[in-house]
Amino acid sequence: MKLKSIVLILAGILIAAYPLIKNTYAWHMQQTLLNEWEEEMKNRSQTENVNGDNMVVLTNTNNNNNNLSEEPSDDAVNSFLGLNELFSEIETDENENSSSSEPVKPTKQPIETIGLIKIEKIKANLPIMEGTTSSVLKVGVGKLIGTSDFGEVGNTALSAHRSHSYGQNFNRLNEIQEGDLITITTMDAVYNYEVYNILVVKPSDVSVLKKSKTESILTLITCHPLYTATDRLIVQAKLLPKE
């Protein structure tokens, strides 16, 4: 009888700790991606120093007003609409109480980091990956398929979950204000953006993906309000002009 009680207590502890284990695993995966990126950047920097090459800091040379008039691609629209199911899946996963004792499963496919996003205002420093699969959104930021490449004239869309853990992923994106800076770093360049537009839209409102004909726009997408996935919090920024 005593053994049975001990087993039940241990089982309860393990089940209660399950959400923490999942969050810790996601954090570990994120840190691994960041460390791998930093190591690759370090190796690349050493090679470039030998060859005389340097990373370029790119800014927008076009001072025209925004003209978000081109419709987004079908792939971009599908990626955006697909976030509804993904956010709901992740939210349900985080909201579930101790009912699940299923062990944490490692990512089935390797995830490759294509860049980093840094938002000093909210102390965010996150890996960016191609695509917006569940595996990607659980550990970092995904670039929507079909949106513009970084620095290109058009609209580059990035999405991340508003994790329940304070400061993790896009948890604090609601604190962003117009004029705040966002930096995107890739293997080849650094892109500096300034926030100019913040809004909340419905999950079906793909107008936020419209492409500028004159400027490089960055659009950040996350679920809103916190703990639900009923709407989308959108933060838009444009590539800064050269000083």
Please tell me what each predicted stretch does.
Residues 2, 8-177, 181-189, 193-243:
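Solvent-exposed, non-transmembrane regions of membrane-associated and secreted proteins
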